[in-house]
Regions:
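Conserved alpha/beta cores of soluble small-molecule-handling proteins
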Residues: 2-170
């Protein structure tokens, strides 16, 4: 039994039977391997949009974006695993959501709602289920949620627009 595990589905304990990517799971090093999908949500005019799962891995921003000029960014990192019975689980993503919310507050960034954080992470993992290593391989799917000031800012002040993204890599 995985204690404090979070199953990657909205209802029930769905077992993923999707065929895994053909990788040498036992010999993967820690590095970036582009997966198929990622989550993107934008903050503008005081509100976060619903966000989308997309195949587009490109981030396009102004040379004067808050993240580039004043390093207004924060991130988290967590992992997804396949259990012996075929479930895909993450360990306590709610705690990552809380830490990211705390980081955002410290940086005068809008908090991405914690429940939406968990939903976005789970949706991204589910969209990349074929990239979650098989049980017993010793590998995991690394999940990187991050947020940054995306609009042009000159002068020391917080940005007014932000982007929250989640990508995965085995």
């Amino acid at each position: 039994t995985v204690v404090d595990a979070f199953y990657v589905q909205s209802a029930g304990k769905e077992v993923f039977t999707m065929e895994k990517k053909n990788l040498d799971w036992a010999n993967l090093g820690f590095g970036y391997v582009k997966t198929d999908k990622r989550f993107v949500s934008n903050y503008k005019d005081g509100a976060w949009d619903e966000g989308v799962i997309t195949e587009d891995d490109k981030v396009v921003i102004s040379e004067c974006a808050g993240v580039l000029q004043y390093a207004q960014t924060c991130f988290e990192g967590l992992k997804a695993y396949t259990t012996e019975d075929g479930h895909i689980v993450m360990f306590r993503p709610d705690m990552n959501a809380k830490r990211m919310a705390d980081s955002a507050k410290r940086l005068e960034m809008p908090v991405f709602p914690e429940d939406k954080f968990v939903e976005a992470v789970a949706a991204t993992v589910k969209a990349n289920a074929a990239w979650v290593p098989p049980f017993g391989s010793g590998a995991t799917l690394y999940i990187r949620p991050y947020m940054f000031g995306s609009n042009p800012v000159i002068g020391v002040k917080p940005a007014t627009e932000y982007q929250f993204r989640v990508f995965t890599t085995p």
